[in-house]
């Protein structure tokens, strides 16, 4: 079982963007589901990852990702987030999977995206760094589900080839 931190309402404070947040860990608490788009971006024999500058998991690494804005097409949101966070222009190629966890209001939609332009650079205040890592030599990942997502992606590579 996954240990889910579920703060009680009295433990909430106003977060950096005005939304309620856990006073212990800083995680934003949403009252309704929020859609997050993420990208696995193959590049130079590895995948692009960002080092988080915000909670949860400051200093740990994950995929370029972000919230989908109201009225925004999901694929466009993923392409926007990769550009904002990594300086890379990408085209979303295919769906890797949909992910959700009990006790978490986030619905995570992960795509594979192909680099079409730009320059790899940390271009966003939400990240400390951006790098390409070999699948066999990953840094400390921000979220438990990241390894499962990578496994799903690698498994899907076998069916595409």
For each feature predicted by the language model, list its residue ranges:
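Acidic, metal-coordinating catalytic segment for phosphate/diphosphate chemistry
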Residues: 3-38
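Active-site donor-binding loop signature of nucleotide-sugar glycosyltransferases
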Residues: 24, 52, 65, 113, ...
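Short glycine/serine/proline-enriched coil/turn segments at secondary-structure junctions
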Residues: 30-31, 57, 102-104
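Conserved beta-strand and immediately adjacent loop positions that scaffold enzyme active sites
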Residues: 38, 46, 129
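Conserved hydrophobic "DFG−1" position in protein kinase catalytic cores
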Residues: 41-42, 49, 113, 132
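Conserved Nudix-box catalytic region and its N-terminal flanking loop in Nudix hydrolases
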Residues: 42-84
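Unchanged
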Residues: 68-153, 159-161
């Amino acid at each position: 079982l996954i240990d889910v931190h579920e703060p009680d309402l009295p433990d909430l404070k106003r977060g950096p963007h005005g939304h309620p947040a856990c006073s212990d860990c800083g995680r934003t608490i949403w009252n309704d589901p929020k859609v997050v788009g993420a990208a696995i971006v193959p590049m130079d024999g590895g995948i692009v990852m960002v080092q988080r500058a915000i909670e949860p998991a400051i200093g740990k690494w994950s995929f370029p990702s972000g919230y989908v804005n109201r009225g925004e097409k999901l694929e466009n949101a993923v392409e926007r987030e990769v550009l904002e966070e990594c300086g890379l222009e990408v085209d979303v190629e295919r769906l890797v999977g949909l992910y959700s966890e009990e006790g978490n209001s986030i619905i995570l939609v992960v795509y594979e995206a192909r680099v079409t332009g730009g320059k790899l650079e940390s271009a966003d205040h939400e990240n400390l760094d951006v790098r390409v890592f070999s699948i066999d030599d990953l840094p400390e990942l921000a979220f438990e589900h990241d390894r499962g997502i990578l496994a799903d992606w690698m498994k899907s590579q076998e069916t595409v080839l």
